């Protein structure tokens, strides 16, 4: 199964890159306590995550219940997230996460265009109890994933998706989910406005 989360890796300048990414989990690698021991990452060539892990084969994978933070990480605008030093590796942990898995690469296949990396968990942080995701959080996640492909998806398709997901926000969102939803809508409007002024191509 693929679990959506946020990855921190170390840039060349020593600062952390924060990026949303799915981790592939084999259920046989989940311990009796529910914690991971291994997982797989598949970053694309050209991404900052690909570069960082090829240069420094370690990082931290986070599970979140903060829909806005996940959206910002996916859309490359999470630079103001609160970080604290990792304990085992040279890197950083997102303070506002539920679980943080410090890892080192155990096996690596850098075949392009997408690497296949097996990560071994070397330290687990249980920052708070996991309460689960509600329908509004899933709505933010779905629109966010779509927004990462805004250059290839028509505005009309986005408007249909927004219309479909909006009731979930109205019925089940708390403050964080509403903030995440508003952030993605503002991100899209900004992209489309720049497209009209010649800053982007738009479908």
Please tell me what each predicted stretch does.
Residues 1-100, 104-203:
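Basic, polyanion-binding surface patches
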């Amino acid at each position: 199964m693929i679990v959506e989360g946020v990855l921190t890796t170390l840039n060349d300048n020593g600062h952390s890159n924060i990026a949303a990414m799915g981790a592939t989990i084999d259920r046989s690698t989940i311990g009796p306590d529910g914690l991971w021991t291994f997982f797989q990452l598949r970053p694309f060539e050209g991404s900052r995550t690909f570069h960082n892990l090829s240069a420094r084969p370690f990082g931290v994978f986070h599970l979140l219940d903060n829909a806005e933070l996940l959206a910002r990480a996916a859309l490359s605008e999470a630079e103001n997230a609160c970080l604290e030093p990792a304990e085992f590796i040279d890197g950083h942990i997102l303070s506002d996460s539920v679980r943080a898995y410090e890892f080192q690469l155990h096996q690596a296949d850098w075949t392009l265009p997408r690497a296949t990396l097996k990560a071994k968990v070397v330290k687990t942080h249980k920052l708070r109890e996991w309460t689960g995701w509600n329908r509004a959080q899933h709505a933010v996640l779905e629109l966010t994933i779509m927004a990462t492909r805004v250059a290839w998806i028509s505005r009309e398709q986005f408007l249909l998706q927004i219309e479909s997901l909006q009731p979930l926000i109205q019925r089940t969102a708390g403050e964080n989910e509403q903030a995440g939803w508003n952030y993605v809508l503002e991100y899209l409007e900004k992209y489309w406005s720049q497209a009209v002024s010649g800053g982007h191509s738009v479908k």
